[in-house]
Amino acid sequence: FLGVLNIINGSAGMFVNIPSLIIVFGGTLMVTMMRSSMSDFVGAVGVAGRSFGNPLEKPEALIEKFVEYAELVRKDGMIALESKVSEEKNEYLKRGLEMLVDGKDKGYVSTQLTKDTEIMVIRHERGADIWSAIGDFGPAMGMIGTLVGLVQMLANMSDPKSIGPAMAVALLTTLYGAFLANVIAFPIQQKLKQRMVDETLNNELILTALNFMQDGGNPRVL
């Protein structure tokens, strides 16, 4: 962002104002922490990081994997999946494979994995809610900073040197608030919502395929 501003007018430094940053980002953080618990806030940051850093498998890739697993099961039984458990990076699928290897029945597997999906949905919904709150509080803090800057400016009209810094606080807090909301918070919120939908669909696909293998289904059907 600052790089773009630097290209436009050759000086990104004029868009950096420490008091404005403290008002917007510090104020937003404080209000968000008052609204929710520390664990929820940390969880929201963590789930956002995982959403950007750990891409989900494509459904097509999962289907190909299950065709291989189903063929293995038809040849050598469920115990043959034990060699695949340690290789599996998808924690949800890995947990399912472990239960199949342990001989858990279909109802047990479905219940446990459905609970895992429900927990994942709650985690993502909480994260999205907190990022939505940050998006709401950011512009509000920007408006507060603008009012603070205007009050400082009007209170020192007799001193021309103080008008510039006060006006900078007034304008830049509005800019920072809009930036925090529309460039950071709301995009992350939407990312979490989409991630939740995609991960839920993947989990449903995995559960269906695991149950299919438990029923002794033909790999060609997959």
Annotate each PLM feature.
Residues 4-127, 199-222:
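Large intracellular
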